Design a protein with these regions (language model features):
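Membrane-interface transmembrane-helix boundary segments in multi-pass integral membrane proteins
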Residues: 151-189
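Short, hydrophobic transmembrane alpha-helix segments
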Residues: 28-37
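Hydrophobic cores of alpha-helical transmembrane segments in multi-pass inner/ER membrane proteins
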Residues: 46-55, 108, 112-123, 180-194
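Interfacial segments of alpha-helical transmembrane regions
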Residues: 53-70, 128-141
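Membrane-interface capping segments at transmembrane-helix boundaries
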Residues: 192-206
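Aromatic-anchored segments of alpha-helical transmembrane domains
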Residues: 21-28, 69-80, 140-151
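Membrane-proximal helix-loop-helix units in multi-pass membrane proteins
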Residues: 78-140
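N-terminal membrane topogenic signal
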Residues: 1-18
Length: 206
């Protein structure tokens, strides 16, 4: 099987350049407002790896980020929509979109959360779903959770210190990280993996 990343760099002849153009705008804009630490967030790593997957034409990278992003971005959209139409957040995590201390143009760039699931479904449909993406994404998330602990409790990147709903923090730290990863895998990653495996299975040998 192997874990080769590259597959067909010509798979997305136009979209790969669109992805590069997006990164040229998005990375400096985000870095100037939120700093480089923000790129440790799972959702922002997903942007970087999706664009890499489009550039390389890699089913493995695109599949892993489809597993990571489709349901998570749907939750983001529901929370933002709830705030917009009902005046309150259902889950939290999109409060910054209404924070006038951040430039409006940069906040609007976060609307990529609405586009990313569609982009990933389209991309995976084009190249096929690689089921190894599920395991790769669990490995990526696990590594990011560990790294996120070094950012400090106040930042709480990727909820590595406390959960976003009840603010609970499990001790010792490995228990909290393991519980967080298990939650991500069971609630977000596994259902998406099963759905994509059924819908966009790649032919044997590819």
């Amino acid at each position: 099987m192997g874990w080769s990343i590259a597959a067909d760099s010509s798979a997305f002849p136009r979209m790969r350049w669109a992805a590069a153009a997006w990164l040229a705008v998005w990375i400096p804009a985000y870095a100037s407002v939120w700093g480089p630490r923000n790129f440790l967030l799972l959702c922002d790593i997903a942007v970087l790896l999706t664009c890499a997957g489009l550039w390389l034409g890699s089913p493995l990278l695109l599949s892993s980020q489809a597993v990571s992003s489709i349901l998570a971005d749907a939750v983001w959209a529901v929370d933002a929509g709830s705030r917009l139409f009902l005046g309150k957040h259902l889950f939290g995590g999109t409060e910054y979109m209404w924070d006038a201390s951040f430039p409006l143009a940069v906040r609007l760039l976060s609307l990529f959360h609405l586009v990313w699931p569609v982009l990933l479904v389209w991309a995976v449909r084009r190249v096929g779903y690689d089921p190894r993406g599920f395991g790769l994404q669990i490995a990526i998330a696990g590594a990011l959770l560990v790294v996120s602990r070094f950012a400090g409790r106040a930042a709480n990147l990727n909820f590595a210190f406390r959960d976003p709903i009840w603010g609970l923090s499990l001790e010792p730290a490995p228990l909290h990280l393991a519980a967080t990863l298990a939650f991500l895998a069971a609630v977000f990653y596994l259902p998406t993996h099963l759905l994509l495996s059924r819908a966009f299975r790649r032919p044997q040998g590819l």
